[in-house]
Amino acid sequence: LEDSYLKTCSGSVVEIGEDKSIILDKSIFYPTSGGQPGDKGFLQFGIGRCEIVTTRKGENGKIILVPLNHDYLPKVGDTVEQFIDWETRYKHMRVHSALHLLSVVIPLPVTGGSISDIKGRLDFNMPESLSDKEELESHLNELIAGGYKITNSWITDEELAAQPGLVKTMSVKPPIGSGRVRLVRIGSDDQQIDLQPCGGTHVASTSEIGSMRFGKIEKKGKQNRRVNIHFVD
């Protein structure tokens, strides 16, 4: 998504799938990807509305909207107004940005991750458990409170291949294949906190995340530890 803060937008129905899923010519719904859940929301058309329970990726970059029921759907060619569940989306944005900071606080290879509207977690290639949990939590919240800008830029697939150090995740491939890759930068050129490829949604400043606390640190196999973080409020 070019603008994570876009809450509503019009679009035209280009396809209704056999499973009654809906594809629009342009969509503000984020599909399940990279550990981030797909958006919920609704489509307004005519005198009715269609609830969307999740969003997923289809072939060739299609964004597939999954309706709650099949009784009242738009038709191909209809113009609809899209409304995402902004409260949930914004929490996903805050958690996703917090996880990028967590990968700075714990500078180890990431083997997995997950985002919800109340917490997030990263799995690290970490044979030994953390001994300084409180110190790391304090460091995370210092970065959040720093109010660092979060911005996007683009490089080509070839440029990313030439800079493998940008990729922190071992289990999830960066969003390549379209010819260009989005980089998410935290901080500025002269005070860069983090830079990594990511197709997800993020807040515009770390200060929007809010205070986080460390939750359970779980052992997941010989080499892996799962670190959970939660909103304080």
Residues covered by each model-derived region:
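Active-/binding-site microenvironments in catalytic and ligand-binding cores
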Residues: L1-D233
